[in-house]
Amino acid sequence: KLKKPVYLGFLDFRQLSQRKHFCEQEVVLNQRLSHDIYQGIVEIRETDDGHFSLQGSGRVVEYAVKMRQLPDAAGLKALLQEGAIDPKRMETLAHTMADFYKGGHRNSDIDYFGRPDIVSYNMEENFRQLDPYVGSLLDQEKWEFLCQVSRTFLDHHRDVFERRVREGHIRDGHGDLRADHVYFHPGPQIIDCIEFNDRFRYGDAAVDLAFLYMDLEHLGHPEWARFFISAYAGAAQDPQLYTVIDFYAAYRAVVRLKVDAFRYPDAQPAAQETLKQDIDAYLQQAYRYAIQFGRPTLWILCGLPATGKSLVAEALSDVLSIERFSSDRLRKAAGISGNGRRTAFGQGAYRMEWRQKVYTQLLAHGHETLKAGHSVILDATFSRRKCRDEARRLAADLDTNLIFAETVCNEETIRSRLKNREGTS
């Protein structure tokens, strides 16, 4: 595999010594996620009479990466087309990536690329470079919406991005993790990482993962995109990934769109038609992601008392860095929590009139938070249909995402927990 003597601003292969260096980098970096594929580098020599060889005498005129060729049929894209992908393979891929990032290189220089101001710089660079195409290649309304909500999301979630830096999610990653570069032969073999510019490889693990997530959807397989992200989040114990994955997926769709837009002016008419279709598809994808992450989410954590509802709500609030309002806290703040002893469900502070007042306050807090553009968790039993319908209306009125999450457990556990509560009151 040769490197052309070119200069493109973000890469410089003009000198033979540079091409040798980046051949070496390509081998070392790609051996992290592949086995027995990258064999090393070879010298290409030229004799005085103009003959070229990989071995023998003569002066070195070029360097190349020596690789073992992978069968096309083992590629993720081919397997998807054949319907040959299964949950076990995707789980293995997710676990491979989780192990890769866990053991990946990290230092202050790498952490720098996860900072919200640097994420913003990279995002704005894409926007600036694509501005000349707005109104011709790019639909203006969709583009302006995408730019606006991307900036707003980053501004509202700076604490999430900063927290991911502190918690070690910024790594020396792959940089070009898409279906074309993933093989199963027999296990995951991931090739063609970016070796020519560290800036394109350093970042949140979510930036890498979002590329494959976006690519799987672009190829018409949203079910595998969701499965892969779910499997990774579980393997890496990174539920906060869900907060940023759509944002980064939109970013990756814009990067792919940009590549096609740059190629468009010099392409032949037939090729331009294909490129325009791809550009439209990537913009639509980014637009759809923006609709998702651009809207706050109303989380309804519901379930019977003693099913672990508040524990889950508190953990979710911490992971997603969003505010939580609890019916129990509102009852206590209103002075209707009883005399300190456990009150039976449906009695005392749980009576209908008090319950309605508490739910009215709970939904009012939710309304204020959502209207300010922030997601919120409402933690209460929500056992009555009327209360659930009011939550649905709130989400519909403010055009927010709505997620109901119910906690359940067996009756024996509930009784045991209630008994323990009574004993400690």
Question: What residue spans do the PLM features occupy?
Answer:
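Conserved substrate/cofactor phosphate-moiety recognition/catalytic segment
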Residues: 317-374, 416
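A glycine- and Lys/Arg-enriched "phosphate-lid" helix/loop adjacent to the NTP-binding pocket
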Residues: 336, 343-353, 396-425
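ATP/Mg2+ or Mg2+-diphosphate-binding catalytic cores
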Residues: 258-301
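The conserved Walker
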Residues: 304-305
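Conserved lysine of the Walker
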Residues: 309
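Hydrophobic positions on the alpha1 helix immediately C-terminal to the Walker A/P-loop
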Residues: 312, 316
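Conserved ATP-binding subdomain of kinase catalytic cores across diverse folds
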Residues: 1-174, 179-255
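Pre-Walker A (Motif I) flank of P-loop NTPase domains
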Residues: 169, 293-299, 372-374
